[in-house]
Amino acid sequence: MVLPKDVKWDLIRQFQRHEQDTGSPEVQIAILTERINRLTEHMKKHKKDIHSRRGLIAMVNKRRKLLEYLRETDYAKYLEVVQKLNLKVK
């Protein structure tokens, strides 16, 4: 699912490290989390939409890998992102 530009830019501004930052792990995790939340709502209504389910699983895996990377490189930033996005971590 594609996010509206205004929602995407709000997330970018909230999590960016500097003015030109659009691709840091924090930003990517925030955008993926919003897409996952929206697609989860879609899946509640359309349980048999296998193509969307596959995309959802891929997004969850990508976010998990980005979270692992962020945890290894900048643990303080990792904790901040997890708290801001209300993510459950093991």
From Swiss-Prot:
CDD domains registered for this protein in UniProt: Ribosomal_S15p_S13e
Ribosomal protein is among the record's keywords: yes
Keywords in alphabetical order: Ribonucleoprotein, Ribosomal protein, RNA-binding, rRNA-binding
Xref: InterPro entries: Ribosomal_uS15 (IPR000589), Ribosomal_uS15_bac-type (IPR005290), uS15_NS1_RNA-bd_sf (IPR009068)
GO BP of this protein: translation
GO terms of molecular function: rRNA binding; structural constituent of ribosome
GO cellular component terms, semicolon-separated: cytosolic small ribosomal subunit
Subunit structure: Part of the 30S ribosomal subunit. Forms a bridge to the 50S subunit in the 70S ribosome, contacting the 23S rRNA.
Family the UniProt entry places it in: Belongs to the universal ribosomal protein uS15 family.
Purpose of the protein: One of the primary rRNA binding proteins, it binds directly to 16S rRNA where it helps nucleate assembly of the platform of the 30S subunit by binding and bridging several RNA helices of the 16S rRNA.
PANTHER family tied to this protein: RIBOSOMAL PROTEIN S15, BACTERIAL AND ORGANELLAR, SMALL RIBOSOMAL SUBUNIT PROTEIN US15M
UniProt protein name: Small ribosomal subunit protein uS15
